[in-house]
């Protein structure tokens, strides 16, 4: 048959279009709605058992920053066994998530450039190397999507995607043979230390990506089942990142 390229109007996330473009023409299309889900997944059961603060709770308090992450990792290592590690992440996956979370775009589509040489990005690479060299990063993490040590409960934080949770060959569900027998928590990558985060301490509303108004009337619950509180005792309902430098991987936005 004969192939023909023709102009076609199609709406999709601009970041998807940019990644599939050649000379300002889009040649790839993603069916359905794009849903960025680039998060860190962690052994919430073990985090609680060793007395560490829950990463998701720190996020909703607006405290899950790069320096907090650094301190958290080091404190966790001191509470783990010698053959256990706080970080068990894919190296490429980690930089793809960590760099945007601190306000860095890794790709400039208009120039066709990959921006790995920016000092704000190379500093993240340097920190990753330091984590590995100083014994905070599991040296046995290979190219597999989910490591054996994470599934065995010997590491705390892992890279992944939402679909891993129900997938037999990834975060194998507990009811399946060889399934993970602990609660998995999920948290965005840590923000820049100077990122502006506004915590909602009362019910609020927002507009979702489909243009619908969503009313938030229930507070965020902590791992103890009680409403999460700020340091001054106010109830937390959510966080507002609109004034922050935080970027969602693959979208270039904070929403």
Indicate residue ranges for each PLM-predicted region.
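Extracytoplasmic/periplasmic solute-binding protein
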Residues: 16-40, 48, 65-114
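Short helices/loops that flank or line small-molecule/ion binding pockets
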Residues: 68-76, 144-158
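Aromatic-glycine-rich donor-binding/catalytic loop that engages nucleotide-sugar donors
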Residues: 45-59
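Hinge/lid segment of periplasmic solute-binding proteins
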Residues: 1-37, 197, 215-232
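Short, solvent-exposed loop/beta-turn-alpha elements that line the ligand-binding surface or hinge
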Residues: 1-11, 58-61, 104-123, 194-200
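Extracytoplasmic/periplasmic substrate-recognition and gating elements
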Residues: 175-255
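Extracytoplasmic "Venus flytrap"/periplasmic binding protein-like
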Residues: 1-12, 49-50, 156-157, 176-179, ...
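Glycine-centered hinge/linker elements that transmit conformational signals in sensory
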Residues: 69-75, 109-142
């Amino acid at each position: 048959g004969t192939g023909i390229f023709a102009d076609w109007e199609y709406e999709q996330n601009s970041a998807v279009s940019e990644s599939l473009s050649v000379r300002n023409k889009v040649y790839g299309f993603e069916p359905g709605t794009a849903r960025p889900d680039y998060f860190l997944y962690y052994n919430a059961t073990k985090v609680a058992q060793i007395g560490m603060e829950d990463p998701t709770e720190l996020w909703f308090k607006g405290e899950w920053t790069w320096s907090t992450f650094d301190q958290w990792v080091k404190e966790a290592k001191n509470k783990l066994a010698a053959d256990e590690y706080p970080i068990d992440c894919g190296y490429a996956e980690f930089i793809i998530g960590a760099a945007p979370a601190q306000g860095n775009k890794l790709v400039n589509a208009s120039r066709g450039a990959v921006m790995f040489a920016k000092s704000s990005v190379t500093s993240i690479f340097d920190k990753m190397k330091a984590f590995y060299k100083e014994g905070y990063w599991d040296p046995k993490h290979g190219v597999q999507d989910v490591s054996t040590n994470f599934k065995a409960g010997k590491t705390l934080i892992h890279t992944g995607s939402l679909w891993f949770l129900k997938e037999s060959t990834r975060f194998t569900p507990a009811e399946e043979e060889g399934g993970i027998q602990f609660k998995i928590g999920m948290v965005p990558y840590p923000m820049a230390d100077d990122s502006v985060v506004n915590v909602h301490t009362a019910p609020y509303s927002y507009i979702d990506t489909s243009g619908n108004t969503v009313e938030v009337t229930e507070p965020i619950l902590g791992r103890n089942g009680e409403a999460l509180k700020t340091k001054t005792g106010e109830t937390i309902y959510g966080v507002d990142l609109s004034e922050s430098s935080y970027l969602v991987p693959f979208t270039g936005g904070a929403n």
